[in-house]
Regions:
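Extracytosolic ligand-binding ectodomains
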Residues: 2-5, 9-15, 31-391
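Sec-dependent signal peptide hydrophobic core
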Residues: 17-21
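N-terminal signal peptide c-region/cleavage motif recognized by signal peptidases
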Residues: 26-28
Length: 391
């Protein structure tokens, strides 16, 4: 176990990313109540490390800042960190550890839909609040799963309309071989069909793919205007590098679902130039809300810390959970589950709203483009309310 105090740094977070680690946060000397233990279950190894660290940073930022302000209801937070290893079986094992051995009051994570779906029965049996802050394909309706997640209504529908107007209506779809890319692409195909466009090809790549030559050849031969990417993690960086090395980025536009500052860190400006992505936050924003999040992140993790959509989502949802505890007057799981919904809060990109009807969030949506190694906003779509996921 590793103690992570208020002087937490990004380097120390990364170093703590193996087995479950308890972040012991010292309570004031006069405190006489037990700390509230919160599990942060993220992929800190296994190919989605960058996303996992960003999720951990966002949750940690909210919890440590709450402690610095005296905690909630006179109680401090204690972080219990665990690694899914980007593997559904491991994710379930770690979830069981957090629930049975670590006695956490809530779990923040994981990242992939495959991991979330694998652990869902465990969560619902234990009646354990799960705070899920990753974009996904939609359809989760559970009392115990609260989502700060961009759904196809947030990202796919406006992105297809934008591409149809600004680029063209022919597409080739490439994704990792799991549920999120497949269902996102199904939504994409449906939207393209409604607008009279064409999807020339659709394929899915295994985890750990190293050579995309055959896929790139098919894309080139299809003569489409746009390639749509939903490859996850390190594989996505490999794909973009090979796409650029083949000179295809000069002729074919790329829409990349989930693209953010996380990926920019692994690409040169030339390799990332022109990539389009829907997002809910980007660090190029200069609003008061964005500057607040960037300032808090720099103060906590250092000025070189990445501030991405993933950080914002986990930071905001964790603060919603903290407010739920304040409203409930305790960390009782059922009471907090009831108390944290029907809540508006300031994110890094304006006010968002957590619905009681399906425990999903109305989000502010941007269309951004990689320019000169940064994500620049092309269009601010404002707040979008997705369809009820329990309807």
């Amino acid at each position: 176990m590793t103690n992570l105090g208020s002087g937490l740094t990004r380097r120390r977070l990364l170093a703590a990313g193996g087995a479950a680690a308890v972040a012991g946060l010292a309570a004031p000397a006069l405190a006489n109540t037990d700390p509230i233990r919160v599990g942060v279950l993220q992929p800190l190894t296994g190919g989605l490390d960058a996303l996992g660290v960003q999720g951990l940073n966002g949750a940690t930022l909210a919890l440590l800042d709450a402690n610095d302000s005296g905690g909630v209801n006179g109680r401090m937070f204690e972080i219990v960190q665990a690694d899914t290893a980007t593997d559904p079986k491991t994710c379930v094992e770690r979830a069981n550890d957090l629930i049975r051995r670590e006695n956490v009051s809530a779990i923040i994570g994981p990242v992939t839909s495959a991991n979330r779906d694998a652990m869902r029965p465990t969560i619902e049996r234990a009646k354990m609040p799960l705070l899920y802050a990753t974009d996904y394909e939609g359809g989760v309706c559970s009392r115990y799963i609260t989502c700060y997640s961009a759904l196809p209504d947030h990202w796919v529908t406006p992105m297809v309309a934008y591409a149809n107007e600004m680029i063209g209506n022919s597409f080739y779809l490439v994704g990792s071989d799991y549920v999120w890319p497949r269902k996102m692409n199904a939504a994409f195909v449906a939207q393209v069909s409604q607008l009279g466009g064409t999807v020339a090809g659709e394929e899915y790549t295994p985890w750990g793919a190293k050579d995309f030559t055959a896929t790139l050849r098919k894309i080139s031969d299809s003569e489409v205007k746009t390639v749509v990417v939903s490859i996850a993690g390190a594989d996505a960086v490999t794909f973009v590098k090979q796409f650029a090395a083949a000179g295809m980025n000069k002729e074919i536009r790329m829409i990349f679902f989930g693209f953010s500052e996380n990926y920019l860190a692994g690409l040169s400006p030339d390799e990332s130039e022109g990539i389009l992505a829907p997002t809910n936050f980007t660090s190029s924003l200069t609003s008061e809300d964005a500057e607040n999040l960037k300032g808090l992140t720099a103060k906590r993790f250092g000025t070189d810390a990445i501030v991405s959509n993933t950080v914002d989502a986990h930071w905001t949802l964790t603060r919603m959970y903290i407010e739920g505890i304040r409203r409930a007057g305790s960390d009782d799981k059922e009471a907090v589950t009831d108390a944290m919904v029907d809540q508006s809060i300031r994110s890094g990109n304006g006010e968002v709203y957590l619905r009681a009807s399906d425990r999903h969030t109305d989000l502010n949506v941007l269309i951004a483009q990689a320019q000169g190694g940064k994500m620049e906003v092309l269009k601010d779509l404002g707040r979008i309310s997705a369809a009820n996921q329990c309807g």
